[in-house]
Amino acid sequence: MSLDLDQVVVDAQNAFASVEDNASLENEKARFLGKSGVLTDLLKGLGKLDPETRKTEGARINQAKSRVEEALTARRQALADALMNARLAAEAIDVTLPGRDVAEGSLHPVMNTWERVAKIFGSIGFDVADGPEIESDWMNFTALNNPDNHPARSMQDTFYIDGRDSEDKLLLLRTHTSPMQVRYARMHVEKYKHLDRIPPIKVIAPGRTYRVDSDATHSPMFHQVEGLWIADNISFADLKGVYTDFLRNFFERDDIQVRFRPSYFPFTEPSAEIDMAFGNGKWLEISGSGQVHPTVVRNMGLDPERYIGFAFGSGLERLTMLRYGINDLRLFFEGDVRFLRQFA
């Protein structure tokens, strides 16, 4: 028992401190504390000593063993801490770095136009109304003074639906937003029927419409905005002023030139196509319009001898194409994100 126990402890501490992984640490543990380890051999040799010496040396060996075990535990904890710190460093986030942009959606360009049109007309006192896309043949055609033999009523131009409404009238996908003229006016008249004179009707009705047509400038589903202003003293001059002001606001130009070209629509009399001047002396049709036909006024529940007004209908796709310089209507419906992202 001449071995220097303090030196054994120091050797164990140095051995444990020099290893960099748990496997090596276990090897060093076996060298000092294993079945054939230095301290284990010393404990086995105590049996050869006399009782008094065995007691003294046993206490010294156990004390040294405790110090070695403490060094072993400390090194294990140090290796575990180092491993955790390495993992944390590898997964660390630099909070000073700029964040990643979250991909945001945006309105479709046609819907942008929809909202822009509604905002412009809303600023001059027009209500915004919505109506059903499935209409009766009567509301879509008859109420708007379309004769029974009008070509628009044919299945080559209109999507008819199986079944009939509660009044046994044919059903179809509306071919224009004009039925909202009659629907909104009737609600307005019902609301104010207790008055001697019905207040002015000022409304636009943007929405989806359907026709059997498809090419670079036509789609079987497209968007229109209908406009209506009826009172007791509305003239064609009001129509020209309102629509010209709308175009100047929509295109953000004060030099816009507009002309009203005589035309024919069953629901207006007189009727006019509204054209807008573009470069090189060219004119492009923007809208159909006119003074509301007396028959239509009557179908609204109003007396055409007392009330008069104007109506117009414009394609939202066409307005969008002109504003952004797009020459193919089909681009709006192909869902190409590269195209749509330009208008975000």
UniProtKB/Swiss-Prot annotation:
Mg(2+) binds at residue 269. It comes from the Bacteria. One of its GO terms (cellular component) is cytoplasm. Its EC number is 6.1.1.20. Gene3D superfamilies: Bira Bifunctional Protein, Domain 2 (3.30.930.10). It is found in: Cytoplasm. Its cofactor is Mg(2+). It catalyses: tRNA(Phe) + L-phenylalanine + ATP = L-phenylalanyl-tRNA(Phe) + AMP + diphosphate + H(+). InterPro entries: aa-tRNA-synth_II (IPR006195), aa-tRNA-synth_II/BPL/LPL (IPR045864), Phe-tRNA-synth_IIc_asu (IPR004529), Phe-tRNA_ligase_II_N (IPR004188), Phe_tRNA_ligase_alpha1_bac (IPR022911), Phenylalanyl-tRNA_Synthase (IPR002319), tRNA-bd_arm (IPR010978). One of its GO terms (molecular function) is magnesium ion binding. Keywords: Aminoacyl-tRNA synthetase, ATP-binding, Cytoplasm, Ligase, Magnesium, Metal-binding, Nucleotide-binding, Protein biosynthesis. PROSITE patterns: AA_TRNA_LIGASE_II. GO terms for biological process: phenylalanyl-tRNA aminoacylation. Binds 2 magnesium ions per tetramer. Tetramer of two alpha and two beta subunits. Belongs to the class-II aminoacyl-tRNA synthetase family. Phe-tRNA synthetase alpha subunit type 1 subfamily. This is Phenylalanine--tRNA ligase alpha subunit. The lineage of its organism: Bacteria, Pseudomonadati, Pseudomonadota, Betaproteobacteria, Burkholderiales. The gene is pheS.
